[in-house]
Structures are given as structure tokens and as C-alpha cells.
Curated annotation (Swiss-Prot):
Signal peptide: none annotated. It comes from Thermococcus gammatolerans (strain DSM 15229 / JCM 11827 / EJ3). This is MEMO1 family protein TGAM_1726. HAMAP family: MEMO1. InterPro entries: MEMO1_fam. Belongs to the MEMO1 family. Pfam families: Memo (PF01875).
Length: 291
């Protein structure tokens, strides 16, 4: 089974420009580490021109901490296709950088242990939130001369119960199979502006990024505190438009079970810094969780 790229050439380059872009993002990359303290990372999934540098901070930290055997990558289901909780079952994912293998054994175990997920490829066919993470992983594993596998999971339902069930299933599957795992939660933060039908406050253009950051940081503080209930409570109270809370909640639950004791915000920005448009502004954050 092969999953072909759906957004190469739009969200990220489909040609040699991709390597040049990744080289620029990782120009300050250190040596591959071996500590393996990082249990999970949060990374955005917009077009690389907007959020690629922010995403690279998550992967830089993971590389310098030590690459795992398997990346379990969770992202929201933007298309509505397929199963509500869909684990890609087996095969390979292709990008302009080549192919990466799905950890079929881990995928099947997560689906079975969760009690809520299905093995389903349709949900992934056109979804970008996971695909845009893959070239970062491929680039770094090529540098390290290693092979890693992925388990892609899309979330059409995102709440505390899903987060707990999936986080627990990923941990139990990793323990049962003896896998060294890092969970990636693919999410953007606030989607502000008339284009998104969400204008909870008004601000001058030069003040807008700061105001959006204030709102996003209410959620980021909950993430840094490993507070799943608080995260979803803030989301509901604010009617916040973060698109991957279930992915982040799952990463928190898994990380706690895996012994994580600290979380760090590595980078934050908004699309306004590039677009200078107030019609549609999105927040992006890079976060890692460590044992």
C-alpha cells in the first residue's frame, strides 16, 4: 500500500527547492544525540513559508536528543473522509524525498488497544496535517544514516476521552512491542480573521500578532503544565480555533505515561509575520516534552 503526496507543490516544494528550504531551516543543526529524553513534540502544519521554521525547531530538538525508532504522528482530519479515528495500517508514504515505511505492527497494536481507532487509509488520502511533517523526518534520518518508521493517525473527533484512550494505547503498544517512540502532535493554533469566521477581538494590524499570542499562550501554558483537562476547558471557554487539540492531548497523555516531567516552548510565531494580512492569521508553536 502506497500513500502518494497530496500537497507537494502547494504546502511545500515538490522539487529540489524542498532540500534547499530544509537546509536553511536546519542551518544551525547540531550533532545527533543519544539521550532520548524527548517523548513528544508539537509542530505546525501550514505551508512551509509560514510555519516551516517553527516546525523545524521541534525536529531539531528531537534530532539533537536522539532519533526514535518510530514517530507516531497525529493530526486533525480536515477533509472529513474515512473513519473518525484513523490509523494508517501499513505500506509506505511517498514525498519528493522518497519513501518512509509505516510501522504496521505498531499501527495494528494501537488500533486494537485503543478501542476507538480503525485501520483506515481513506482518511489520510488528501489530509495535509501529517504529510507536511514527513519531509522533516526524512531529511534528518537521511543525515543520520538511519531508518525510522511512522504511524500516521488522523483525528476527526478530538476531546479528552479520545486523548486519553489514544495516549494510553500508544504507550501500551510501545511497551508491548519494545518500541522507542516519539509522538508528534500536528496542530496550528488560533485561526483568526474574517476568512475563518472567527474574530473574537479587534486590534490594529500592528497589535494583532501580540493579541493572538496572548490567546494562544493560554493554551500553551496548559500544554506546558501537561494539563489535558485545562486545555480543553480553555478551548471551550474561549471558543478557540486551534485545530489539533486531540493530537496535543494525546501527546500529553502519552508523555506522562512515558515519564515526561518537563515541557518547553521552543518557538512561536504567526502567519502575519509573513503575509501581513489581517484577513486570515494563524498561530504556530514548537513544543517538546521530556523525561
Amino acid at each position: 500500500m502506497i500513500r502518494y503526496p497530496a500537497v507537494a507543490g502547494s504546502f511545500y516544494p515538490a522539487d529540489d527547492e524542498l532540500i534547499l528550504m530544509l537546509e536553511k531551516f536546519f542551518s544551525d543543526l547540531g550533532e545527533e544525540g543519544s539521550e532520548r529524553r524527548i517523548t513528544a513534540g508539537v509542530a505546525p502544519h501550514a505551508g512551509y513559508i509560514f510555519s516551516g521554521y517553527t516546525a523545524s525547531r521541534t525536529y531539531k530538538a528531537i534530532f539533537e536528543d536522539g532519533l526514535p525508532e518510530t514517530f507516531v504522528i497525529l493530526g486533525p482530519n480536515h477533509t472529513g473522509l474515512g473513519s473518525p479515528i484513523a490509523v494508517y495500517p501499513e505500506g509506505e508514504w511517498l514525498t519528493p524525498l522518497g519513501s518512509i515505511e509505516v510501522d504496521a505492527e505498531m499501527a495494528k497494536e494501537i488500533a486494537k488497544l485503543s478501542g476507538i481507532a480503525d485501520l483506515d487509509e481513506l482518511a489520510h488520502k488528501y489530509e495535509h496535517s501529517i504529510e507536511v511533517q514527513v519531509p522533516f523526518i526524512q531529511y534528518l534520518t537521511e543525515l543520520a544514516g538511519k531508518e525510522v518508521k511512522i504511524v500516521p493517525i488522523t483525528l476527526g473527533i478530538q476531546d479528552e476521552d479520545v486523548s486519553r484512550a489514544l495516549g494510553k494505547a500508544i504507550f501500551e503498544a510501545s511497551e508491548k512491542l519494545g518500541r522507542d517512540v516519539v509522538v508528534i502532535a500536528s496542530t496550528d493554533f488560533m485561526h483568526y480573521g474574517p476568512a475563518y469566521g472567527y474574530v473574537p477581538f479587534r486590534a490594529r494590524a500592528d497589535e494583532l500578532p501580540h493579541r493572538i499570542k496572548e490567546w494562544d499562550f493560554r493554551l500553551i501554558r496548559r500544554i506546558l503544565d501537561f494539563d489535558v483537562d485545562g486545555l480543553f476547558r480553555e478551548l471551550r471557554e474561549m471558543r478557540h480555533t486551534m485545530c489539533g487539540p486531540g493530537a496535543v492531548g494525546t501527546a500529553i497523555v502519552y508523555s506522562r505515561l512515558a515519564g515526561a516531567v518537563e515541557a518547553e516552548l521552543l518557538h512561536y510565531t504567526t502567519s502575519y509575520e509573513i503575509s501581513r494580512s489581517t484577513e486570515a492569521v494563524v498561530g504556530y508553536a514548537s513544543i517538546v516534552m521530556r523525561r
